[in-house]
């Protein structure tokens, strides 16, 4: 389990567990800060002492290998998993370079040291300053509350009112600072994933230029370089999209925190001061407790907690409520007090003090006191305002009309759906389209009055105005689950199954929309809207959560993955019936308990080749972006990759054991491209390297593979000498263990999967076979020949 999300609503409760979560985030940032300092120190050693290059590289590699990114939430995306694994790949590369004993003369000041120092000083340093302010304000706030609550009720009303106003102003200031600090903590946790890895990539690219064998090794790992670059760009895009949503949620809660309280199992909860009586002549003391009450069971929990003493939880008490009585100031020299009698403690009465008169009234209402408010502590979440958009005949007409206009007029427009239209024009167009009298009069395909960006914004706005998202609140969680776990095949199968559980109108509308988005992605070379970019734009629209929380916003990246799967597998999902017996998604980190050990075909090979990397200089300046808007995603991965890369892809060579091994291992760019579902990514990757010698020879990788076509378009034609001596012709095999692919040339499968055309592979311990039209490598001890 990674770091828990910090909810903005918890800033107003300031519970002990909220403080524990804050400390966990702070500890992680401190660990990151120390690691970056050590990394910078190691980088400077490389510059200062070439004679100690070997020692410095080993230390550097060790640091990279041991560091692991923490994440917010209960799962990570494939992009984040690849980014996390990239540090270990870089570590292996450094060890490989150390074996070669090459003399390296490289200045890493501009490519590594400065970006890391900038990140540490500007980002981590800013968090430290925020922490100091937060700690100082915490001390001030609770000290003032203590002092305020000790005021005698006999003082003049004007004096008491002035003190009340001062305390309330101080509390509001504390809440403001707490909100900003929580937002900053979560932002830096997400930001470091890409701002930290990018300088590393630049540093490694510089190293390649100083090694004679760097060019050949880079070709071997070209697929990894491209995939990691896309992973980083996707992560950046998702971060930018999520950040605006988080800031919007924070502003909503800041304006009206009471209306955004999270649903809780407790009727009331919060801090109360409890009077602890002592034997004479010591009097009594007031101790702050965090109290929780369940009205149904009349169960009252209270835990002593002091913010200023390190925030350690004390031993809690639990009792059952008998009755609650309001205390008047003529019977006690404190304000906001009430008494509680416990049913299981006869004769024992506890006197408690709330922070304010309003909070006392709320507690009295929850506890069954005489004075009650019209609202309780944990009010239900206010539902979203629903527009008059519906999935009726008019709704389908509007969507089809917008789609037809977009495909006719602007399918090649750069930033399609990413560039937003003028709000007033969008609202006017929607009003005309949703009016029965004017809908047929609106000509979107030929009229110059409506820009394409206005039409696309109107389409998205209409979908967001539906009473319920297209993929429904009921199935929202079910769609998220396969995006968080399982193999690529099992994800597609699970989402295929869930789509057919949607109401018929929802499924029909989703089919129309996804078919259109597939067409848009097929023109990504012109409009720059890849499948990933479309996922970022339409994820929140098609799968908005029912409750707005930080935890829900952290799942935006998984919503994007679901939309990507829908686009990449549109024909299968909407044109074929689902398999009602598909297996449950398997967690990516889980392995079968009794599966035999797998013999890695890269054993002994991976340590002999470095990670292919690139010189990354991604500066997304607002002035260079022609499409600035709140809803825009950042510059797409295609945009940042469109410049010709100095690293070329692997080209077909003469047959031989080494060459065949390289191709089977995924060194060929064509192999990697052919394993990506759909035509979009294959053509996209070819466009990224327009000067690559494989562009013209990789046409077979552009079109989706048919069951009879070869999945390895770059493999040289096999000769008699190349054929394995014990070839198995036209044999079938059944999987006896589930398997998760570790490489693009391998197959993922579940127990019971049937493989066609199984043959012995050149890789020891591996077979080649076809599953669902895709050919790849299979661990020999995971299957049984039929």
Swiss-Prot record:
Q: Where is the composition biased (Low complexity)?
A: 634-651, 689-712
Describe how it is modified after translation.
Phosphorylated. Phosphorylated in vitro by constitutive active PKN3.
- Keywords assigned by UniProt, alphabetized: Cell membrane, Cytoplasm, Endosome, GTPase activation, Membrane, Phosphoprotein, SH3 domain
Q: Where is this site: Arginine finger?
A: 418
Region: Disordered, residue numbers: 576-608, 621-727
What biological-process terms (Gene Ontology) are attached?
A: cytoskeleton organization; negative regulation of apoptotic process; regulation of small GTPase mediated signal transduction; signal transduction
Q: Which cysteines are joined by disulfide bonds?
A: none
Q: In which tissues is it expressed?
A: High levels of expression in heart and skeletal muscle.
Q: Provide the protein's localization.
A: Cytoplasm; Cytoplasm, Perinuclear region; Cell membrane; Endosome membrane
**Rho-GAP domain location:** 389-574
| GO CC list | cytosol; endosome membrane; perinuclear region of cytoplasm; plasma membrane
Q: Where is the composition biased (Polar residues)?
A: 676-688
The record places domain PH at: 265-372
Q: Which PROSITE patterns match?
A: PH_DOMAIN, RHOGAP, SH3
GO MF entries:
GTPase activator activity
Q: Where is the BAR domain?
A: 7-262
Q: What sequence ranges are listed for the domain SH3?
A: 728-786
Provide the function of this protein.
GTPase-activating protein that catalyzes the conversion of active GTP-bound Rho GTPases to their inactive GDP-bound form, thus suppressing various Rho GTPase-mediated cellular processes. Also converts Cdc42 to an inactive GDP-bound state. Essential for PTKB2 regulation of cytoskeletal organization via Rho family GTPases. Inhibits PAK2 proteolytic fragment PAK-2p34 kinase activity and changes its localization from the nucleus to the perinuclear region. Stabilizes PAK-2p34 thereby increasing stimulation of cell death.
Subunit text: Interacts with PKN3. Interacts with caspase-activated PAK2 proteolytic fragment PAK-2p34; the interaction does not affect GRAF2/ARHGAP10 GTPase activation activity towards RHOA and CDC42. Interacts via its SH3 domain with PTK2/FAK1. Interacts with PTK2B/PYK2; the interaction negatively regulates GRAF2/ARHGAP10 GTPase-activating activity. Interacts with MICAL1 and WDR44; complex formation might transit from GRAF2/ARHGAP10-MICAL1 to GRAF2/ARHGAP10-WDR44 complexes.
Per the record, what about its domains?
The BAR domain is important to associate RAB8A (or RAB8B) and RAB10 to endosomal membrane to promote tubule extension. The BAR domain is also important to recruit WDR44 to endosomal tubules.
Q: What protein name does the entry list?
A: Rho GTPase-activating protein 10
Give the organism, scientific name.
Answer: Homo sapiens
> What's the encoding gene here?
ARHGAP10
């Amino acid at each position: 389990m990674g770091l828990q999300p910090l909810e903005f609503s918890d800033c107003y409760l300031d519970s002990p567990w909220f403080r524990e979560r804050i400390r966990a985030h702070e500890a992680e940032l401190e660990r990151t800060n120390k690691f970056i300092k050590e990394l910078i120190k190691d980088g400077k050693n490389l510059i200062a002492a070439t004679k100690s290059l070997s020692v410095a590289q080993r230390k550097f590699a060790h640091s990279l290998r041991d560091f692991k990114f923490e994440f917010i939430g209960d799962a990570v995306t494939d992009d984040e998993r690849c980014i996390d694994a990239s540090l270990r790949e870089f570590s292996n590369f450094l060890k490989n370079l150390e074996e070669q004993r090459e003399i390296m003369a490289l200045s890493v000041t501009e490519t590594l040291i400065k970006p890391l120092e900038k990140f540490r000083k500007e980002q981590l340093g800013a968090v430290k300053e925020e922490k100091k302010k937060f700690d100082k304000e915490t001390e001030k706030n609770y000290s003032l509350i203590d002092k305020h609550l000790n005021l005698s009720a006999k003082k003049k009303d004007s004096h008491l009112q002035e003190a009340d106003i001062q305390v309330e102003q101080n509390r509001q200031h504390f809440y403001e600072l707490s909100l900003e600090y929580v937002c900053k903590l979560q932002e830096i946790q997400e930001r470091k994933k890409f701002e930290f890895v990018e300088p590393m990539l630049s540093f490694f690219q510089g190293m390649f230029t100083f090694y004679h064998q760097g060019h050949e090794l880079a070709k071997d790992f070209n697929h990894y370089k491209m995939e990691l670059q896309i992973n980083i760009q996707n992560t950046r895009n998702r971060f930018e999209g999520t950040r605006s949503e988080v800031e919007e949620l924070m502003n909503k809660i800041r304006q009206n925190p009471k209306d955004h309280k999270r649903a809780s199992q407790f009727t009331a909860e919060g801090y109360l001061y409890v009077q602890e009586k002592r034997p004479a002549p010591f009097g009594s003391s007031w101790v702050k407790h965090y109290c929780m009450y369940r009205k149904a069971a009349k169960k009252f929990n209270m835990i002593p907690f002091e913010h200023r003493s390190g925030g350690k939880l004390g031993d809690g008490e639990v009792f059952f409520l008998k009755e609650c009585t309001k205390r008047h100031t003529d019977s006690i020299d404190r304000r906001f007090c009430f008494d509680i009698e416990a049913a299981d403690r006869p004769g024992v009465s506890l006197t408690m003090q709330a922070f304010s008169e309003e909070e006392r009234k709320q507690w009295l209402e929850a506890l069954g006191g005489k004075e009650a408010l019209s609202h309780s502590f944990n009010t239900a979440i206010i539902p979203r305002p629903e527009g008059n958009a519906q999935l009726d005949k008019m709704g389908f007409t509007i969507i089809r009309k917008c789609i037809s206009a977009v495909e006719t007029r602007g399918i090649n427009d750069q930033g399609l759906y990413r560039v937003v239209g003028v709000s007033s024009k969008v609202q006017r167009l929607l009003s005309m389209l949703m009016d029965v009298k004017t809908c047929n009069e609106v000509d979107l395909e030929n009229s110059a009055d409506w820009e394409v960006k206005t039409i696309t914004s109107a389409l998205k706005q209409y979908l967001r105005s539906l009473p319920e998202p297209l993929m429904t609140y009921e199935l929202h969680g079910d769609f998220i689950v396969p995006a968080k776990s399982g193999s690529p095949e099992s994800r597609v199968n699970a989402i295929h199954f869930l789509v057919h559980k949607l109401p018929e109108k929802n499924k029909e509308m989703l089919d129309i929309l996804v078919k259109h988005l597939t067409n848009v992605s097929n023109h990504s070379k012109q409009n720059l809207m890849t499948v990933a970019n479309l996922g970022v734009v339409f994820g929140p629209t098609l799968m908005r959560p029912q409750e707005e929380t930080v935890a829900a916003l952290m799942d935006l990246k998984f919503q994007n993955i679901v939309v990507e799967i829908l686009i990449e597998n549109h024909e299968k999902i909407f044109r074929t019936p689902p398999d009602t017996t598909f297996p449950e998604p398997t967690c990516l980190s889980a392995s079968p308990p009794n599966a035999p050990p797998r013999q890695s075909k890269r054993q002994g090979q991976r340590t002999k080749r470095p990670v292919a990397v690139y010189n990354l200089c991604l500066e997304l300046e607002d002035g260079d972006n022609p499409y600035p808007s709140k809803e825009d995603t950042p510059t797409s991965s295609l945009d940042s990759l469109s410049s010709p890369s100095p690293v070329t892809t692997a080209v077909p060579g003469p047959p031989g054991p080494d060459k065949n091994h390289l191709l089977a291992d995924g060194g060929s760019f064509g192999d990697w491209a052919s394993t990506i579902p759909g035509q979009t990514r294959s053509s996209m990757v070819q466009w990224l390297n327009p000067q690559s010698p494989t562009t013209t020879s990789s046409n077979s990788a552009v079109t989706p593979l048919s069951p009879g076509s070869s999945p390895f378009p770059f493999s040289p034609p096999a000769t008699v000498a190349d054929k394995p001596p014990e070839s198995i012709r036209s044999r079938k095999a059944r999987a006896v263990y589930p398997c998760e692919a570790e490489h693009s040339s391998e197959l993922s499968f579940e127990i019971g999967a049937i493989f066609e055309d199984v043959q012995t592979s050149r890789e020891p311990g591996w077979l080649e076979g076809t599953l669902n039209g895709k050919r790849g490598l299979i661990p020999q001890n995971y299957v049984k020949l039929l």
